[in-house]
């Protein structure tokens, strides 16, 4: 391809530590230093791509403070957010009473590689991106050379 850029042709952009701290005040140098190699590994080179990644991580993890998905829904909110998976307010009320694991299994069960009973909870949102579903854990694990599909709690450490 005539217009394709090689990796060496791309300018590398990374936010300064001060910019990082402004966006993620609860973190420190350790997290910042862990973040920089990920930019290189996953070819997040440009300011636009870095900004998009940081915005996504910030939104999904409440500023890198929530590294595991909460299922603290009211029945009304559960029905509003997941109307395809939760069909009625009565069903939402039953799920909320049963707790977070039941909610996760209904919302995430039976799709994107989640096949076994309990997979919705097992492969719930974790990490800065709130990675969900077995298939995504397997893909991310392959990219990171980590056994995320068999040890999903490792995502919280990334």
Segments from the language model and where they lie:
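N-terminal secretory targeting signals
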Residues: 1-8
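Short helix-to-loop capping/linker segments positioned immediately adjacent to catalytic or ligand/cofactor-binding
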Residues: 41-44, 116-118
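A short alpha-helix/helix-coil micro-patch that ends at or immediately precedes a cysteine
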Residues: 34-42, 59
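Extracellular/periplasmic catalytic domains that process cell-envelope and extracellular macromolecules
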Residues: 45-49, 121-124
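Solvent-exposed, polar/charged alpha-helical surfaces in well-ordered, non-transmembrane soluble domains
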Residues: 33, 37, 51-54
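Peptidoglycan-targeting cell-wall enzymes and recognition modules
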Residues: 8-30, 58-158
């Amino acid at each position: 391809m005539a217009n394709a850029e090689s990796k060496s042709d791309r300018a590398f952009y990374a936010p300064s530590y001060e910019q990082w701290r402004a966006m993620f005040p609860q973190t420190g140098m350790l997290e910042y230093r862990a973040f920089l190699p990920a930019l290189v590994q996953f070819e997040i080179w440009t300011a636009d791509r870095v900004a998009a990644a940081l915005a996504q991580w910030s939104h999904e993890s409440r500023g890198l403070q929530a590294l595991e998905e909460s299922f603290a829904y009211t029945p009304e909110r559960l029905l509003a957010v997941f109307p395809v998976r939760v069909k009625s307010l009565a069903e939402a009320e039953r799920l909320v009473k049963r707790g977070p694991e039941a909610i996760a299994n209904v919302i995430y069960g039976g799709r994107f590689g989640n096949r076994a009973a309990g997979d919705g909870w097992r492969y719930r949102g974790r990490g800065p991106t709130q990675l969900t579903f077995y298939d995504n854990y397997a893909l991310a694990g392959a990219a990171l050379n980590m056994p995320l599909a068999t040890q999903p709690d490792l995502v919280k450490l990334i």
